[in-house]
């Protein structure tokens, strides 16, 4: 998905049980922090989420790396509306216990489908996540 997650909804999702899921890991973005890449990692009952950097779409192009590898990466992930922002989380689990359809539905319910109608209004959404980065004075 390309749309951002609602911060409260995805935070609640991260703190719920995921029956049959053994491991998950991936990247995400939330409407209240459009410049930052969030990372989620789960093993068993332990779930960790943190900021790991900025999306390239928020970095001035004169600071982008040069070369065919980076260009190929941008070609693969770039979207005219969202840049390189995306939701990309992988779930690994027991086939007999993990309900992939349910996980997808629960994640889809966390997306802000009409984000592009007024992005600024969603930047001020309630955000229960801890601070990811401190500003250096």
Q: How does the language model describe each region?
A:
Residues 1-137:
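P-loop NTP-binding site
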